[in-house]
């Protein structure tokens, strides 16, 4: 029987995940729990030694990559780094992990004396990146480029037969719980990180699977196989 996999992340990344799910022989079902709403914000990079992106949504919300293409970019993971390269940034480095790994990458490759850092992200950020970097002597300017707005009603997909639901952020889990965790007891929750799995543990699932590393391919391998 073909596994039916609910994808809770927002567009446009949801479509990319759907393609990867389909490539592994499962049936993707779009079930967005968040909508990404761009915010007007200061896009100037003057005086910045580097830009920091904690999600690909932040990259998509940056309107003038060509104007800043020579500013180094530090990204939380490979998906975000790939989005930055596609947007035209020339010097892109990936922490290949979570916010803690990103903070470590900044501290080992950059100097506080070289200029400020601009962190472009959403209205909700996992962890305390600014706090860690400020404690290490860096000046960090946080720019809120988008808001992740939670769904007010459960997507229709949760009324259909499903086997697995994928969570790429704790924010998506929070939105799911706020909707009453529809069908959780019969579903496998696939979580991209331990932080997300901890949020999901607020309710009972058929099973909770955590990716061995915060990479989508690892998440799909752990939940779907193939």
Language-model regions: role of each:
Residues 1-226:
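Signature of uroporphyrinogen-III synthase
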């Amino acid at each position: 029987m073909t596994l039916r996999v609910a994808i809770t992340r927002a567009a446009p990344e949801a479509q990319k995940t759907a393609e990867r799910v389909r490539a592994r022989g499962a049936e993707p079902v779009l079930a967005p729990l968040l909508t990404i709403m761009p915010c007007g914000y200061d896009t100037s990079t003057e005086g910045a030694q580097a830009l920091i992106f904690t999600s690909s949504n932040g990259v998509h919300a940056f309107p003038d990559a060509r104007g800043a293409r020579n500013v180094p970019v530090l990204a939380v993971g490979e998906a975000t780094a790939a989005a930055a390269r596609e947007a035209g940034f020339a010097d892109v480095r990936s922490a290949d992990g979570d916010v803690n790994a990103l903070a470590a990458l900044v501290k080992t490759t950059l100097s506080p004396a070289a200029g400020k850092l601009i962190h472009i992200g959403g209205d909700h950020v996992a962890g305390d990146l600014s706090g860690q970097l400020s404690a290490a002597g860096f000046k960090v300017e946080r720019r809120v480029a988008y808001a992740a707005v939670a769904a007010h009603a459960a997507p229709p997909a949760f009324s259909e037969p499903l086997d697995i639901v994928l969570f790429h952020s704790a924010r998506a889990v929070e939105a799911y719980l706020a909707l009453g965790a529809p069908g959780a007891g019969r579903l496998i929750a696939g979580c991209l990180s331990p932080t997300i799995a901890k949020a999901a543990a607020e309710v009972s699932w058929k099973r909770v699977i955590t990716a061995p590393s915060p990479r989508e391919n690892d998440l799909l391998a752990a939940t779907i196989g193939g």
